[in-house]
From Swiss-Prot:
InterPro entries: Aldolase/citrate-lyase_domain, Citrate_lyase_beta/mcl1/mcl2, Pyrv/PenolPyrv_kinase-like_dom, Pyrv_kinase-like_dom_sf. The keyword Manganese applies. Optimum pH is 7.1. Pfam families: HpcH_HpaI. This is Malyl-CoA/beta-methylmalyl-CoA/citramalyl-CoA lyase. Homohexamer. Dimer of trimers. Substrate binds at H32, F33, K40, R92, A183, D184, L274. The keyword Metal-binding applies. The gene is mcl. It comes from Chloroflexus aurantiacus.
Length: 348
């Protein structure tokens, strides 16, 4: 069951901020994760914040159980001490069935709720998970006089979560979007891979036999094509954003870039970075190609109102390609506001 339309945007607690109706317009090409319990990494955060679109403190996977409270406290400490400027601030809390999650949310909202943009919830399986966090956040926001609503980002890591995507997307006006969690999702599905994202050398198609050909070529395929496309469809239909999650082979930058590029072309807004070397990869991939932007601008200039037909370099352009061009140019304009070098290259 969903709320009736006239109740959907009402605050869930007296004194909680009014829910938003549209997501903020801002670049989110790279969501950089950091472990807040590590002091030397916390010390670098003010500098890292200048390089990324989103910083996400990680309290869940990869944080040892005996360091959970230290990670939470470290996150609060670094947030209090840092001016993030126009960089968005997220936190991935522990799973909703864990002994830490209630304190994660309560203590972080109480201490730094007015600086926090998004809470990422791991292993979301259905709208009931979002409803719980939605109500809990509203009560905390009211208690601590938080000025703007904290949004919810759902991490897709189970087959049940994938089945319930539409219901999750429409569960609350707090919904920001989805991220793909390939390792846990692979385990949940029973996929036969130990890789965190990326392809697999045994997953592909074999070319038809050709006369005189000694070997039939084998073409490796993307394990995550269907999942990403489904996630993007549901997110966009609900006005949300879709993100490729982690790519685990930190040293294989070429494979990381290829996986990120597939996600970008399919409609994802951005991807996670787990190490500093993945930051420029994500920023490069999720910024539209300069030549694509320049060509898209020509389409918009030739068809100012999007109607009619134009021929550009021998290619027919119509209202459908005008819409495609507008997507590219709108993204380029948004990124240009944050990146002077790209602004110059795009001519914006």
């Amino acid at each position: 069951m969903r709320k009736l339309a006239h109740n959907f945007y009402k605050p869930l607690a007296i004194g909680a901020p009014e829910p938003i109706r549209e997501l903020p317009v801002r670049p989110e090409r790279v969501v950089h994760f950091f472990p807040p319990h590590v002091e030397k990494i916390r010390a670098r955060i003010p500098e890292v914040a200048k390089q990324v679109d989103v910083l996400c403190g990680n309290l869940e996977d990869a944080i040892p159980m005996d360091a959970k409270e230290a990670a939470r406290n470290g996150f609060i400490e670094v947030v209090k001490a840092t001016d993030f400027g126009d960089t968005a601030l997220w936190v991935r809390v522990n799973a909703l069935n864990s002994p830490w999650v209630l304190d994660d949310i309560a203590e972080i909202v109480a201490a730094v709720g007015n600086k926090l943009d998004v809470i990422m919830i791991p292993k979301v399986e259905g709208p009931w998970d979002i409803h719980f966090v939605d109500q809990y956040l509203a009560l905390l926001e009211a208690r601590h006089q938080i000025k703007k609503p904290i949004l919810i980002h759902a991490l897709l890591e189970t087959a049940q979560g994938m089945v319930n995507l539409e219901e999750i997307a429409g569960a609350s006006p707090r919904m920001h979007g989805f991220s793909l969690g390939p390792a846990d999702l692979a385990a949940s599905r029973g996929m036969k891979t130990t890789r965190v994202g990326g392809g697999h050398p045994f997953y592909g198609v074999l070319a038809d036999p050709q006369e005189g050909q000694a070997e039939r070529p084998f073409y490796q395929q993307d394990l995550w094509h269907y999942t990403i496309a489904r996630m993007v469809d549901v997110a966009v239909a609900h006005g949300l954003r879709a993100f490729y999650g982690p790519f685990g082979d930190i040293k294989d930058e070429a494979a990381c870039e290829a996986q990120f590029r597939n996600a970008f072309l399919l409609g994802c807004t951005g991807a996670w970075s787990l190490a500093p070397n993945q930051i420029p990869i994500a920023k490069r991939v999720f910024s539209p190609d300069v030549n694509e932007v320049l060509f898209a601008k020509r389409i918009l200039e030739a068809m100012p109102d999007g109607s009619g037909v134009a021929m550009i370099d021998g290619k027919m352009q119509d209202d459908a390609t005008w819409k495609q061009a507008k997507v590219i140019v709108d993204l380029a304009r948004m990124i240009a506001k944050k990146d002077p070098d790209l602004a110059q290259a795009y001519g914006l």
